[in-house]
Amino acid sequence: MKIALILFLCVGVALADDIASAAGQIFNSILPNLISNSVTRQQGNSATNTLQQIGSVVGGVVDYAKKKSYEEMLKQVQDSTTDEDLLRISEEMFNADLNNALNYIQVNLQGKTSPMSKSDEAPSSLINVPENVWNGPTIRPFAALFDNYHKNVIRPEFVTPNEETEQVTYINTILATGPMRSLMNFLVSKGLNQMNEYQEQVELLKKIWFTKYARHWTGLCKCSCAFENVFMAELKSNEVLGLHSWLFFAKREMDRKANYLGYIDKLDLGGKGLILKQHSILSETKDAPELTMFVGTSPELETALYTLCFMARPDRPCKLRFNNVPFTIQTKTLKAENLILIDTAYPVF
């Protein structure tokens, strides 16, 4: 009996090694396709299908262990991530950002201003984005989400099947990019073994960024989500909330719904982007005295950085670095639907 048990355990170990080896071989074989597909914008292709195969192969290993709940995952990352981890992984994410757009857009800072000033120190637009940039492999599905929301926090919003498809398309697209692969590998290294499964990655990002919650004090209207606040803008009475995306701001400028008054301060991120603090008027009358945003960075890099800091340093300064330039991301959280979610997130320097 003992001999049979020993033989059974040996076979189990061998099978586990074979499964892990198979997963590694599959992933290495599709890396060229992942890079190519991120450039050619092909959706539902063999690379995506093979990623799902990785999920099922590695999932065979994960299923033998107890999967962590959402709350347990957040606590695990928060407790196990060191300050040095954050500096290292942020450098890695920036270096992996192949869809950086800084060299393809025009940024016209013009005059300096202050949060209290009402003077227009910038007669021209802040950002000019050429059409080919809007059609970029990750920017196109990102911008497709802009018309899915209404800026008023008490106006009801209902997610249609098409809008949910657009959410998943965006998530699938960015999961094939360098910054998001770095994030998922980092989460696995912190003990979140289920992040080896592709569908688990999709569900995590969908939960963090697209779970609907109420922002108004009545709590009656689930009219907001993290994506809408961070990457777009919301209005609560006359107060502008969010608006930390340079792409959304550029779109508002194109539509003549944003008037850039000038910049307050800026930080150069070693040629890979800027962090800009600026003053603008939205929708002709809504004052946004101190907006902070990355400029030129890709949607996937920003999503990866904000997700990292939400999980590792919620409600605290998340100190990062690129090319020896230090900066911080500040996240604020709220509890809704019995979940800890992103209230807002933005860069600070």
Which positions does each model-derived feature cover?
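Compositionally biased, low-structure terminal segments
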Residues: L9-V11, N28, M232, F249
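Low-complexity, intrinsically disordered/propeptide-like segments
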Residues: F8-G12, L34-N37, I54, V77, ...
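N-terminal, immediately post-signal peptide pro-regions of secreted/luminal proteins
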Residues: D17-K68
